[in-house]
């Protein structure tokens, strides 16, 4: 790829990779295939990978040392954020997200980071962030049930699930019902405590998958 973007590295797909070390090696190989690497400076595992490669890099985060940094973060409506982006301490853009969720601040920072080497202008980044209203199965509102919004999200890892639940909670809903479909029993078994913590304040119903029980 011309530009590789690493948002985070978490303990996922370990049934294939076996260890975090081998998972990091896979990301290292991906980064080495890229001419330029854009990475999240707030994620320790990602920083470890980037420190092991010799490629031009652009960092982003809330970390003061990141090249592209989010500051003055505020909610302009429940669950939706706006903030200033600094590049090397200087104003780059003011981002107003069209999608909910604190984690999307990092997605927008990655986008701003990519804009610079691609020759795009700050206004392009601002417009893209404001006009993007999500993609399929990422906090996608499918309809309503008795007046309550029904949201579909492909959060199949505890970290993702926690972000989805936090977004729903920040949007002010008084009652959150989580319908969880485990996409592999092996992952669910290995990370059961983390899954439980992610949905600890919701009503939970689990659906089966086609994988054999473990």
In which residue ranges do the predicted regions lie?
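Glycine-rich phosphate/diphosphate-binding loops that line cofactor/substrate pockets in enzymes
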Residues: 167-176, 201
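Cofactor-binding loop segments of dinucleotide-utilizing enzymes, especially the Rossmann-like FAD-
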Residues: 62, 181-183
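Acidic, Mg2+-coordinating active-site environments of NTP-dependent enzymes
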Residues: 1-150, 173
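Structural/interface elements that position substrates and couple domains in central-metabolism enzymes
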Residues: 151, 155-161, 198, 210
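Residue-level detector of conserved catalytic or cofactor/ligand-binding positions
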Residues: 199, 203-214
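Charged helix-capping and loop-helix junction motifs
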Residues: 21-24, 189-197
